[in-house]
Amino acid sequence: MSERLKLKVPASTANLGVGFDSIGLALNKFLYVEAEISDDQKWHFHHKGENLHDLPTDENHLIYQVVQFLEKRFEVTVPPLKITMRSEIPLARGLGSSASALVAGIYLADFFGQLQLSEFEMVEAATEIEGHPDNVAPVIYGGMVSGFYNNHTNETYISFIEPPRVNLVITVPSYELKTHDSRQVLPDSFKHGDAVQYSAISNTMLSALIQHDYVLAGKLMEMDGFHEPFRQKLIPEFEKVKSIAKEYKAYATVISGAGPTILTLIDPSKSGKLVRRLNKELDECSSEIIIINKSGIIAEKVYE
C-alpha cells in the first residue's frame, strides 16, 4: 500500500507595524503540496503555476534543505520524495511564502521520517531555522501569534492572541523584494531611549488589540521605529496606499512582513470600497480583501 501526504499551508503576514519579528497572522492564501515516496530513490520536485516557476528542482530547494535539517537534528532518514506543488502565495512579497514552504518541509520530514513531532516541536524546529516565530507559528497554528526566540538558549516562546475583528486588505506590487535586501536597510543598533519607546508602543498596541480597541491599536501600529521608516523607502506605493486608506477611515496601513506587500486594517463595511479605489488608482499593484486563516496547516494522509 502506497501512502501520500497532502498539505494545505496558509500564507502569513508578520510584524503588524510595531511587532517586528514577533507578531504574525495566518492568511487564506495557500501553498498546496502533495508528496509520496519516489520510485527511483531520487528527489523530484514538480511546480505548477506561475508563482513557483523559478524555484530550483534540485538539492537547493528549500523543502529538501529543511528535510535534511530535520534528518540531522533527529537522527532519522527520510526516503527520497516525489513532490508536487502549486501556490497562491506570490514569492518575495512579504506574505510568508518561504515560511509556508519551510513548514511544509517539516511536516514531510515528520510524516515520512516517522518523527511524531508535536505542533510545538514543529514550531521550535521552524523557528530555529527561520530565526523568529512570527511567520511559522501562525502557519502551523492558524490565527494570530506573538513569539520570541532566544538564540542563546535555543528556546522558543509563543502566545496566542484573538485575531482582530477587522477586514484585511493587501496591496501587492508587481515587483519582488527579497527579505535579505529589505533587512539590509535596517540599522545595526538603536539608542536605548528609542528602543524603550518602540517597545512600549508595541506593548500598548497588543493591549489595545486584546481590548478590541482598533482605533488605538491602528494608531500605534503606524508608530513603529524599528523597521518601517527604513523599509518604506523601498516601496514607492506605500504613502499613496496609506493616504487613500485614511480616506476610508482605515485603522492602519503597514508593511506586510519585509514587503513590498502593503497591509491595511479596516472596518468591514468600507473594505470593498477601498479595494476598488486602490485597484483603480494603482496600475502596477493588485489589491484584494484577504481573510484571516484560523485553522493553520491542514495535513491529509492518503493511502492507496
Curated annotation (Swiss-Prot):
Q: Which reaction does it catalyse?
A: L-homoserine + ATP = O-phospho-L-homoserine + ADP + H(+)
> Any one Gene Ontology biological process term?
threonine biosynthetic process
- What are the annotated GO cellular component locations? cytoplasm
Q: In which pathway does it act?
A: Amino-acid biosynthesis; L-threonine biosynthesis; L-threonine from L-aspartate: step 4/5
One Pfam family in the UniProt entry: GHMP_kinases_N
Q: Residue span of the signal peptide, if any?
A: none
Keywords of the record: Amino-acid biosynthesis, ATP-binding, Cytoplasm, Kinase, Nucleotide-binding, Threonine biosynthesis, Transferase
EC number from the UniProt entry: 2.7.1.39
- For binding ATP, which residues are annotated in this chain's numbering? P90, L91, A92, R93, G94, L95, G96, S97, S98, A99, S100
Q: Which InterPro entries does this one have?
A: GHMP_kinase_C_dom (IPR013750), GHMP_kinase_C_sf (IPR036554), GHMP_kinase_N_dom (IPR006204), GHMP_knse_ATP-bd_CS (IPR006203), Homoserine_kinase (IPR000870), Ribosomal_Su5_D2-typ_SF (IPR020568), Ribsml_uS5_D2-typ_fold_subgr (IPR014721)
Q: A Gene Ontology molecular-function term?
A: homoserine kinase activity
Q: Does the keyword Amino-acid biosynthesis apply?
A: yes
Task: Quote the HAMAP family the UniProt record gives.
Answer: Homoser_kinase (MF_00384)
Q: Which family does it belong to?
A: Belongs to the GHMP kinase family. Homoserine kinase subfamily.
Q: What is the name of this protein? A: Homoserine kinase
Its gene name is thrB
